[in-house]
Swiss-Prot record:
The keyword Membrane does not apply. FAD binds at residues 7-12. Belongs to the MnmG family. TrmFO subfamily. NCBIfam families: gid_trmFO, PRK05335.1. This is Methylenetetrahydrofolate--tRNA-(uracil-5-)-methyltransferase TrmFO. Keywords: Cytoplasm, FAD, Flavoprotein, Methyltransferase, NAD, NADP, Transferase, tRNA processing. The keyword tRNA processing applies. Its cofactor is FAD. One of its GO terms (molecular function) is tRNA (uracil(54)-C5)-methyltransferase activity, 5,10-methylenetetrahydrofolate-dependent. Catalyzes the folate-dependent formation of 5-methyl-uridine at position 54 (M-5-U54) in all tRNAs. Its EC number is 2.1.1.74.
């Protein structure tokens, strides 16, 4: 039995590698260079279309841990990245042409891989199937995936608000409440008086935004208005939108605030909060500067900054299992950014797990759920259990991990403890499931 893969980006390439390592053949479809996307320049596999950085290398950084876990699992993407690394301080950056060419050569010349350079316009009947078509999935395939998943669970753009660590919010200022005291006090409210709002407003409308790429120019017409664009419509606009204060009383004053920024839990543990209605296209340093002007967020630590860009992805909390299988048809897998993981390394990690599990399906073995205390397990655990209504793509971060059993003081020691626990857990998991780095 052959596994069919749509897309030879980071996820599809890694999935193909993991499958053939298990002795299972692959039919790999890649439409480039016959049909190009607005961002790609070549027909090579795993082409890096934006930065050449795979981000932080140290284990204190969750993406550094994810890379180390992938190395231990025999990742082709990490093998190529390490072989084609270029100096980048504390980050892992690569020679993008050498990196992509290395991966392409290994897969094209592999005896168990059949390459088809053509666009897939309909969902193939072949199973198992891995859909790893990426953030710039073609219009025809997008329509086909919508038919498979349902239109309500398929998106064309990110519109993600910033997320902050709960422990960095000043609870002497912010207060828990829902409007008019209806239901549970599910929102953490950051109140502003008129002078605080005036300063915040001026900073927001004059802050520097990222320039839009040509293929992203229609983004604002999809119903996801950046908070800074909304603000420029008039000084009162936000007061009738995401910063409206109605139904809320500041317990410090006993009065309704002039404006309120609401924070909502991002995960079940309540270790992260997102700024409700604050989808933004501001540059990251500007987000830090402007959003730290919000009372209660002066010392906020950002898990993720807000982003808005072209990105095809599905509603994974509704559709996927933590194995990256489609709930309604477990012989279909999704992998990469289309699942709602964000970033080069995260996409490749999703491909690694999907590929490993597709091979196991062919072999008559049960798919694996990686431990949630590992980086490679925390990602699918998050994207398949996040609140479906507000789901947006996510990078790997230690905020996704289960809390440590013992309290550890200090951010760096806490991150080191997470990394130690993760690698120990991964080694046990690999031994229990007979996963080896070299085959």
């Amino acid at each position: 039995m052959t596994v069919t893969i749509i897309g030879a980006g980071l996820a599809g390439a890694e999935a193909a590698w993991q499958i053939v390592r298990q002795g299972v053949p692959v039919q790999l479809f890649e439409m480039r260079p016959t049909e190009m996307t607005p961002a790609h320049k070549t027909g090579n596999f795993a082409e890096l279309v934006c930065s050449n950085s795979l981000r932080g290398a140290a284990l204190e950084n969750a993406v550094g841990l994810l890379k180390e876990e992938m190395r231990r699992l025999g990742s082709l993407i990490m093998e190529a990245a390490d072989a084609h690394a270029v100096p980048a301080g504390g980050a892992l950056a690569v020679d993008r042409e050498g990196f992509s060419a290395c991966i392409t050569e290994k897969l094209v010349n592999h005896p168990r891989i059949t390459l088809c350079r053509e666009e897939i316009r309909e969902i193939p009947a072949a199973r198992p199937l891995i859909i790893a078509s990426g953030p710039l999935t073609s219009p025809a395939l997008s329509r086909a995936i919508q038919g498979l998943t349902g239109e309500d669970y398929f998106y064309f753009y990110d519109a993600a608000a910033p997320i902050v660590y709960a422990e960095s919010v000043d609870l002497s200022v912010a207060f828990w409440a829902s409007r008019y005291d209806k239901g549970d006090a599910d929102y953490l409210n950051c109140p502003m008086d008129e002078s605080e709002y005036d300063r915040f407003y001026e900073a927001l409308v004059t802050a520097e935004a990222h320039p839009l790429k040509e293929f992203e120019k229609e983004i604002y017409f999809e119903g996801c208005m950046p908070v800074e664009v909304m603000a420029k419509r008039g000084k009162q606009t936000l007061l009738f939108g995401p910063l409206k204060p109605v139904g809320l009383i500041d317990p410090r004053t006993g009065r309704r605030p002039f404006a309120v920024v609401q924070l909502r839990k991002e995960n079940r543990q309540g270790s992260m909060y997102n700024l409700v209605g604050f989808q933004t296209h501001l540059k990251w340093p500007e987000q830090k500067r402007v959003f730290r002007m919000i009372p209660g967020l002066e010392q906020a630590e950002f898990v993720r900054y807000g982003v808005m860009h072209r990105n095809t992805f599905i509603n994974s909390p509704t559709l996927l299992l933590p194995t990256y299988q489609l709930r309604k048809d477990p012989s279909v897998f999704f992998a990469g950014q289309i699942t709602g993981v964000e970033g080069y390394v995260e996409s490749a990690a999703a491909g690694l797990v999907a590929g490993l599990n597709a091979a196991r399906l062919v072999q008559g073995r049960s798919p694996l759920r990686f431990p949630p205390e590992t980086a490679i397990g925390a990602l699918p655990a998050y994207i398949t259990t996040a609140e479906a209504k507000h789901f947006q793509p996510m990078n790997v971060t230690y905020g996704l991990f289960p809390p440590l059993v013992e309290k550890v003081k200090g951010k760096r020691p806490r991150q080191q403890a997470h990394a130690r626990r993760a690698l120990e857990s991964l080694e046990r998991f690999m031994a229990e499931n007979l996963i080896v780095k070299e085959i």
